[in-house]
Amino acid sequence: TADAKIGLEKLSSALGGHTYAGPDAGVKASWFAKADAVTAAPADSNSLPTDMQVIGAVQRASRDNTVVMCAAGTMPGELHQLWKSKLPLSYHMEYGFSCMGYEIAGGLGIKMAEPERDVIVMVGDGSYMMMNSELATAVGMGVKITVVITDNRGYGCINRLQMGTGGAQFNNLYAHSNVSPIAIDF
């Protein structure tokens, strides 16, 4: 720990004569090329897309004024790495507490605050199941948002965290889920 002023002075001293030369366009271009590769459409049209490929499809279909919104699960981490914001204030993530269920309500609020912008909510099936009721609010108010639901059989992110920390799988995947995909246009 350090006093802010003292800490900055020590960091400045440690840097010596090194200065920031500005952004490196080559690094950005290299990253975008890698991102484009993993977000490209699946080569096999009969296979299910990865979350990364879903992000790519949404990105390609979005307009410059689009705001993407997400809150919980694995999707914020993927969007953080792969989404290419086209305008300022077009990337809305709730990182702090991974609030499952905030996505649709948050998207509704964004659209109400900026009605001229397109709002795309990216949500996992677990968060969607926790709180999808704000869709009825959006319809009742005539507020158009787009909701993209990704499916990892329930709470796949929680399952991976549980298993990765030495826990046993417990009631967080829908192993026998064979329901049809949701296609709703209000």
Report the location of each language-model feature.
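Electropositive phosphate-/nucleotide-binding environments in soluble metabolic enzymes
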Residues: 2-5, 9, 21-32, 45-56, ...
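A charged, well-structured terminal subsegment
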Residues: 13-21
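Short conserved AdoMet
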Residues: 16, 63, 114
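Active-site diphosphate/adenylate-binding microenvironment
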Residues: 29-106, 110
